[in-house]
Amino acid sequence: MPKRILQGVVVGDKNEKTVVVRVERRFAHPLLQKTVRRSKKYKAHDENNQYKIGDTVSIEECAPISKDKRWTVISAQGK
């Protein structure tokens, strides 16, 4: 099974070797058919503490690293 890859914005970098990434998804409301935005935060592993708040990054699913971390940052798209 391929690993999932998501794109999001770093919203937290205070933890050691961890960043919090907000991933936004859009979908049509089932009744109103209006486009709705929902977001979810994921904790991702950042080995070198190189990503800062505001960076757009790609995260990839991985084996559990800690209680909450199951994602790792693979690349940055820019600010």
From Swiss-Prot:
Transmembrane segments: none annotated. GO terms for molecular function: rRNA binding; structural constituent of ribosome. Disulfide bonds: none annotated. Keywords: Ribonucleoprotein, Ribosomal protein, RNA-binding, rRNA-binding. It holds the Pfam family Ribosomal_S17. GO terms for biological process: translation. One of its GO terms (cellular component) is cytosolic small ribosomal subunit. It comes from the Bacteria. InterPro entries: NA-bd_OB-fold (IPR012340), Ribosomal_uS17 (IPR000266), Ribosomal_uS17_bact/chlr (IPR019984). Part of the 30S ribosomal subunit. Belongs to the universal ribosomal protein uS17 family. One of the primary rRNA binding proteins, it binds specifically to the 5'-end of 16S ribosomal RNA. HAMAP family: Ribosomal_uS17_B. This is Small ribosomal subunit protein uS17. It comes from Rhizobium johnstonii (strain DSM 114642 / LMG 32736 / 3841). The gene is rpsQ.
